[in-house]
């Protein structure tokens, strides 16, 4: 933190399972398990509780939700996603964002949400993480972009870029 320049220190954690890096914090089921309930309120509530626990330990920025639409079961990060259905991923991810940020994310029990990983990181060639993607424009627009459109409309404050090459 640079006090004389008023640049705040932001502490972020990978909160896919809640604030699970801290002893005594609640460890929530994986997102794909939460998604299996088709209960948006559950996802929202997990977001609220995660934000509360994160702020109590000094964190401000949750590197979650993962709104990749899972397309290849061989991909090693399937459990971090809300599944293979673009509608379900959109609804559960948006609910999580709303729970984490609760409107504007300013306040003692709110955190910055980070929708990740833009874009199409979940359909790598042969299921290998970091592999390039070869997808059509239609697939991009109908499968991968809807969760991000909804996240932006919900006011997500940050989006994490993917590390994969798309149609390169």
Predicted regions and their residues:
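Glycoside hydrolase catalytic-domain context in secreted enzymes
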Residues: 3-168
């Amino acid at each position: 933190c640079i006090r004389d320049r008023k640049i705040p220190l932001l502490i972020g954690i990978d909160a896919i399972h809640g604030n699970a890096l801290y002893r005594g914090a609640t460890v929530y089921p994986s997102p794909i398990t939460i998604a299996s309930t088709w209960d948006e309120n559950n996802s929202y509530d997990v977001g609220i509780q995660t934000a509360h626990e994160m702020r109590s330990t000094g964190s401000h920025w949750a590197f979650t939700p993962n709104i990749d639409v899972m397309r290849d079961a061989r991909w090693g990060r399937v459990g971090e996603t809300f599944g293979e259905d673009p509608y379900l991923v959109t609804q559960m991810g948006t609910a999580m964002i709303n729970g984490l940020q609760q409107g504007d994310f300013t306040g003692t029990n709110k955190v910055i949400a980070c929708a990740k990983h833009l874009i199409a990181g979940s359909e790598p060639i042969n299921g290998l993480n970091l592999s390039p993607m070869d997808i059509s424009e239609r697939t991009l627009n109908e499968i991968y972009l809807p969760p991000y459109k909804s996240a932006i409309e919900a006011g997500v404050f940050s989006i994490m870029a993917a590390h994969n090459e798309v149609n390169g």
